[in-house]
Design a protein with these regions (language model features):
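Canonical P-loop GTPase G-domain recognition
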Residues: 208-259
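Nucleotide-state-sensitive switch-loop elements of NTP-binding domains
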Residues: 33-72, 77, 86-173, 184-186, ...
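Hydrophobic positions on the alpha1 helix immediately C-terminal to the Walker A/P-loop
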Residues: 82
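Histidine-centered metal-binding segments
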Residues: 1-38
């Protein structure tokens, strides 16, 4: 069985492992089967095509004076709750568009409606790898659902998954992730791909720390082991604790000269 394919920062793709199965037949040519090299070539082509479309998306944003943020997390981290609070705070200051990615349903999109932002829903169940991430062609298909010339900021809420979304450029200018204390302090060490890729980490649900065997400093230290430069913001989207720092980061990112 082939191992999982992974893309490095330089664009190269490789498998992590090859699972050997017990048998005594010859490992010669298996007619009709792709070799590992052939499969890697196909994946590199997919990534290359994705990067072309990502650059197209980024150019579309920039031609309209838009800053785009890719917001990622594992399922249940509180990403949508963070986004709700963000719209409530900033929609009066910036014209915000949201591309809401989910495998199915419009539940999260419905939570964001009526908060002063344009929302374009993107269900991913039919796309390549769509069960676990957004890619640039998917985001491109969502753009007609937004009035780009009217916007200042687009937030792309990616599918809840701790690995795959970080490997696909969707045309953003920065990546952010929501990481909740309920996920455990070891996640940056066990699943470093996303943590390495982001510009800002929101350590969410800190209001639950008194009820957990958890130490915020340990969470932060583990993030620092894999990403020495990311901004780390302990927050509670539910209570509002620490969220002012996140709003300030977004204001600077979106180009507000007053912040």
């Amino acid at each position: 069985m082939m191992g999982r394919f992974h893309r490095h920062d330089d664009g190269t793709v490789h498998t992590h492992e090859h699972d050997h199965h017990p048998h005594d037949h010859d490992h010669g040519d298996h007619s009709g089967y792709e070799t590992e090299t052939q499969r890697i070539d196909v994946l590199e082509e997919i990534f290359a095509e994705n990067d072309v479309r990502a650059n197209f998306n980024r150019a579309a944003f920039e031609s309209n004076g838009i800053r785009a943020l890719n917001l990622m997390s594992s399922p249940g981290s509180g990403k949508t709750t963070v986004l709700q609070a963000t719209l409530d705070e900033l929609a009066g200051e910036f014209a915000i568009g949201v591309i809401e990615g989910d495998i199915a349903t419009d539940l999260d999109a419905a939570k964001l409606s009526g908060r002063g932002a344009q929302v374009s829903l993107l269900n991913t169940s039919n796309g390549f790898g769509g069960e676990c991430h957004l890619d640039a062609p998917m985001v491109n298909r969502a753009l007609p659902g937004l009035d780009l010339p009217a916007l200042d900021l687009v937030i792309i809420e990616n599918v809840g998954n701790l690995v795959c979304p970080a490997e696909f450029d969707v045309g953003e200018h920065a990546k952010a992730m929501v990481y909740s204390v309920t996920e455990g302090e070891d996640k940056p060490l066990k699943y470093p791909v996303m943590f390495r890729s982001v510009d800002v980490v929101l350590l969410n649900k800190i209001d639950l720390v008194p009820h957990l065997d958890a130490d915020v400093d340990t969470y932060i230290a583990h993030v620092r082991e894999v990403n020495a430069t990311a901004t780390i913001l302990p927050v509670s989207a539910r209570t509002g604790a620490g969220m002012a720092a996140w709003f300030g980061w977004l204001r600077r990112f979106a180009g507000d000269p007053e912040d």
